Amino acid sequence: MNKTSLPPIDSIDRQWYVVDAENQTLGRLATEVAAVLRGKTNPSFTPHLDTGDFVVVVNAEKIKVSGRKPQQKLYRRHSGRPGGMKVETFEALQERIPERIVEKAIKGMLPHNALGRQMFRKLKVYKGTEHPHAAQKPQPLQLNPSASAQ
């Protein structure tokens, strides 16, 4: 029986990508970014190793959702104290902390364990077009080409 060769974790060459979220649909952007973070786009993908790349998402405040979701989609969080449940709509959260919307959507598509937390640390989300990762020379990652044509 042949053994499957695994890439040594220190030999994985991680790329940096930048994604412009302007006029992108939240879920469609999140699925593609989650696949890159997970490493599914790499030929050396292994489910139990973190082989993913770094992703920088800019223009988080310009993300789109369809239908009545801006008024009806709710984001819940709890402080851990009695009566500490906070509920906020997509619109309100987008105005206050637009980065959290993108982070929460992508985090829900990663594994829910220590490996998923490690993958999530490679995601950087920013409001506006500026980001502090220019030294890493991130390459633009083209997502959903049909949405940019509209």
UniProtKB/Swiss-Prot annotation:
The keyword Ribonucleoprotein applies. Part of the 50S ribosomal subunit. The gene is rplM. HAMAP family: Ribosomal_uL13. CDD domains: Ribosomal_L13 (cd00392). One of its GO terms (cellular component) is cytosolic large ribosomal subunit. InterPro entries: Ribosomal_uL13, Ribosomal_uL13_bac-type, Ribosomal_uL13_CS, Ribosomal_uL13_sf. Residues 139-150 have a biased composition (Polar residues). This is Large ribosomal subunit protein uL13. NCBIfam families: rplM_bact (TIGR01066). Belongs to the universal ribosomal protein uL13 family. It comes from Synechococcus sp. (strain CC9605). Pfam families: Ribosomal_L13 (PF00572). Keywords: Ribonucleoprotein, Ribosomal protein. One of its GO terms (biological process) is negative regulation of translation. One of its GO terms (molecular function) is mRNA binding. This protein is one of the early assembly proteins of the 50S ribosomal subunit, although it is not seen to bind rRNA by itself. It is important during the early stages of 50S assembly. Residues 129-150 are annotated as: Disordered.
